[in-house]
């Protein structure tokens, strides 16, 4: 029981540190959609990722371009299936993300310049990256 309480305390302290870091930059980490339009989608990326919409778009593009090439299949008479990403399946500690395909999934590497910590760490040096704990 004591370790559970200690873990909650650590989690809360970590959230305050990340929030303070984001507040000190004075920037909105969510940002605008890459096409310049306002977008109401909220992503669960950490505050040290500068533009959540652009970041999600870049991951989706990497997913779409990964091999084997995506096959557009008609799921029913109204929809087609394309590859997807899930913002909860981005691992900032290991610098990977999950690309969801129609019949299989693949784990891909994040770009080397991806922020992976509140102190300007990037995926260039994975050993310095810290895990993101959403909703802690």
Swiss-Prot record:
Q: Which InterPro entries match?
A: Salp15
Pfam family membership, one:
Salp15
Leader peptide range in chain numbering: 1-22
Protein family according to the UniProt entry: Belongs to the salp15 family.
What switches on expression, per the entry, is described as: By feeding. By the presence of Borrelia burgdorferi.
The ranges of region (CD4-binding) come to 117-136
Name the keywords, alphabetized: Glycoprotein, Secreted, Signal
Protein name (Swiss-Prot/TrEMBL) = Salivary protein 15 Iric-2
Per the record, GO CC terms?
Answer: extracellular region
Glycan-modified residues: 105
Compartments (UniProt record): Secreted
Q: Does the keyword RNA-binding apply?
A: no
Q: What does this protein do?
A: Salivary tick protein that downregulates host immune system by binding to both dendritic cells, and CD4(+) T cells. Specifically binds to the CD4 coreceptor on T cells. This interaction prevents the activation of the Src kinase, Lck, and its downstream substrate Zap-70, and results in deficient activation of PLCgamma1, the repression of calcium fluxes triggered by T-cell antigen receptor (TCR) ligation, and a subsequent reduction in interleukin-2 production.
Q: Does Glycoprotein count among this protein's keywords? A: yes
Q: How does the annotation summarize its subunit structure? A: Interacts with host CD4. Interacts with host DC-SIGN (CD209). Interacts with Borrelia outer surface protein C (OspC).
Tissue expression as described in the entry: Expressed in salivary glands. Detected in fed adult female.
Species for this entry: Ixodes ricinus (Common tick)
Task: Classify the main location.
Answer: secreted
């Amino acid at each position: 029981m004591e370790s559970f309480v200690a873990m909650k305390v650590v989690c809360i302290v970590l959230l305050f540190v990340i929030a303070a870091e984001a507040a000190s930059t004075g920037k909105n980490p969510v940002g605008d959609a890459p096409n310049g339009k306002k977008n109401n989608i909220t992503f669960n990326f950490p505050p040290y990722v500068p533009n959540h919409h652009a970041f999600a778009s870049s991951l989706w593009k990497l997913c779409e371009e990964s091999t084997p090439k995506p096959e557009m299949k008609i799921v029913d008479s109204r929809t087609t299936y394309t590859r997807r990403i899930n913002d909860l399946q981005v691992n900032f500690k290991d610098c990977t993300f999950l690309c969801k395909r129609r019949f299989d999934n693949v784990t891909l590497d994040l770009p080397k310049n991806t922020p992976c910590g509140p102190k300007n760490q990037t995926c260039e040096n994975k050993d310095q990256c810290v895990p993101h704990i959403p909703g802690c």
